[in-house]
Amino acid sequence: MAVPKKRTSKSKTNLRKTVWKKKALKQAIQAYFIASRASKKLNLEKAITKDLNTES
């Protein structure tokens, strides 16, 4: 016969949520900086090709 499990305490639940949110925040920051670097690199490449086209 199935027996109900004990209820998880609120503090344990909050702790797990906090850990999850910190991991998500860390990944979001990392993704932002990667996108930022890629954007800067793309802008730099566009500027270089624009300069090369105007010199010719």
UniProtKB/Swiss-Prot annotation:
Its main location: plastid. GO terms for molecular function: structural constituent of ribosome. One of its GO terms (biological process) is translation. The keyword Membrane does not apply. Keywords: Chloroplast, Plastid, Ribonucleoprotein, Ribosomal protein. GO terms for cellular component: chloroplast; large ribosomal subunit. It comes from the Eukaryota. It is found in: Plastid, Chloroplast. InterPro entries: Ribosomal_bL32 (IPR002677), Ribosomal_zn-bd (IPR011332). Belongs to the bacterial ribosomal protein bL32 family. HAMAP family: Ribosomal_bL32. This is Large ribosomal subunit protein bL32c. It comes from Tupiella akineta (Green alga). The lineage of its organism: Eukaryota, Viridiplantae, Chlorophyta, Ulvophyceae, OUU clade.
